[in-house]
Regions:
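Bacterial N-terminal signal peptides
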Residues: 8-19
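Short beta-strand elements
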Residues: 25-28, 71-74, 79-81, 90-91, ...
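Short, compositionally biased P/S/T/A/G/V-rich stretches that sit at domain boundaries
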Residues: 22-53, 57-59, 79-87, 232-237
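Sequence/structural segment immediately N-terminal to covalent heme-attachment motifs in c-type
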Residues: 91-114, 126, 136-139
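Axial heme c-ligation environment in periplasmic c-type cytochrome domains
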Residues: 108, 117-128, 141-170, 181-192
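N-terminal secretory signal peptides that target proteins for export/translocation
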Residues: 1-6
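C-terminal capping alpha-helices of c-type cytochrome domains
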Residues: 50-52, 58-62, 69-79, 158-184, ...
Length: 237
């Protein structure tokens, strides 16, 4: 009897220690994201284009050596009224819908702001704005494909995206696709444009925030370390 009691106690103790270790285990490290250009606190004329470069390191891989696809990097250019304000450095979390967009082949035909093989997300958001069934319609187009919605072209189906993922993308397009204060650019390098939603003041500019959108290891988050936010002040308004 004493042996059984000791054995039971040992099992309970081992279970408690295991649970404690699991609770104490630190979360898996997130990505290291650095905007290497433009320089922080740089200045650029409104309406001008500036170049950007982002490096991402995660799970022993890096964009420097093309081990992480360029499509797994996203840059957001957000208008800020005062580049010296603390809020100008508080980047919003990356919407999960944009993770789905960049991990699928959406960017092969769609751009955020310009027409390419298909309409831009901004144009789609404007066309369907205010329509009560817009989210369901867009989600169905994403999952099942469509024909004739934008001229004579057709959109292929995306069965790799589940209903919840397609709905999240549709909701984002309707709520934020045509937001004049934020523009998104896919890729580890490229160009952004200094655009303001209205007449900018003398302290206004853009907050550039970079994100890793690729797959994560179990327990990891997208909370990035590194210089993933820089501010560019607009000139010549």
């Amino acid at each position: 009897v004493q042996f059984k009691v000791l054995a039971s106690f040992a099992v309970v103790l081992a279970s408690s220690l295991t649970a404690a270790l699991l609770r104490a285990a630190p979360p898996a490290p997130g990505p290291q994201v650095d905007i290497t250009s433009p320089a922080d606190h740089s200045r650029l004329a409104w309406q001008a284009r500036g170049s950007y470069t982002v490096t991402v390191a995660y799970d022993g891989k890096s964009t420097r050596f093309d081990e992480i696809p360029s499509s797994n990097v996203l840059l957001a250019a957000t208008f800020v009224a005062d580049t010296d304000a603390p809020a100008a450095r508080r980047a919003a979390p990356l919407p999960e819908a944009l993770v789905h967009v960049t991990q699928s082949n959406c960017m092969g035909c769609h751009d955020f702001n310009a027409s390419s093989g298909g309409p831009s997300f901004a144009a789609i958001g404007k066309r369907y704005a205010g329509q009560p069934t817009a989210a369901a319609t867009l989600a169905a187009h994403i999952r099942n494909g469509s024909r004739g919605a934008w001229g004579s072209g057709s959109m292929p189906p995306h069965p790799d995206l589940g209903p919840a993922q397609a709905t999240a993308i549709a909701d984002w397009i309707l709520a934020h696709g045509a937001d004049p204060a934020v523009r998104y650019y896919a890729g580890k390098s490229g160009s952004f444009r200094m655009i303001a939603p209205g007449k900018p003041g003398p302290r206004a500019g853009l907050m550039l925030s970079a994100y890793y959108t690729g797959p994560l290891k179990s327990g990891a988050t997208r909370n990035a370390s590194g210089r993933n936010v820089v501010v560019v002040t607009g000139t010549g308004s």
